Regions:
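Anionic N-terminal interaction surfaces
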Residues: 1-59
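Generic preference for well-ordered secondary structure
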Residues: 13, 17, 23-25, 49, ...
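Conserved beta-hairpin
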Residues: 49-75
Length: 170
């Protein structure tokens, strides 16, 4: 059993998802997530701007954010969002313990702003969700470019003058 399989079902049961729901969405998630990627969060969510568009299931791993949608009438599964965390920009979330919810927003690589509302049962779960999102988006995502740290008072290293040597033409 791979890492994704070992971590997905416990995360789904922790979120209170029925086993049927988790196993129904599993093939879609399996196509998007690598076998070595551990699940951080699985939860139901909705779209605040489209409340009647169906049920959504959000999967957050250390590398990807995947959201599936179940259509309201025929209950078909559709992939709504599949993005690496480093491809997402302007990621924000706002926890609201009074409403027992966290609103997550991110701009996908195609420029479309996605907003999801995650509801919890208790206010304490709002702060747990906030900590998970903070861990995933602030501490795990690093830029690929190395950081260059220098101070203004630092003197540059001695630069050797370029010496030119004549080339022998034959």
């Amino acid at each position: 059993m791979d890492v994704f399989s070992r971590t997905f079902l416990p995360a789904a049961s922790e979120a209170g998802l029925a086993v049927q729901t988790a196993t129904r969405h599993m093939p879609v998630f399996r196509r998007c997530v690598g076998s070595g990627d551990a699940t951080i969060l699985v939860t139901r969510c909705s779209r605040p701007d489209r409340p009647m568009s169906g049920d959504y299931l959000l999967l957050l791993t250390h590398r990807r954010l995947v959201v599936t949608r179940q259509t309201p009438v025929l209950h078909r599964l559709r992939l709504h969002l599949n993005a690496e965390l480093r491809e997402l920009s302007h990621v924000t979330w706002s926890p609201d313990p009074r409403l027992h919810s966290v609103e997550l927003a991110a701009t996908a690589i195609d420029g479309i702003r996605e907003r999801f509302l995650v509801r919890t049962q208790f206010p304490k779960q709002v702060w747990q969700l906030d900590a998970l999102l903070n861990h995933a988006f602030r501490t795990r995502v690093r830029s690929a470019l190395p950081r260059v740290v220098a101070t203004v008072a630092e003197t540059p290293t001695a630069v050797r003058p370029a010496t030119l040597h004549p080339a022998v033409a034959r």
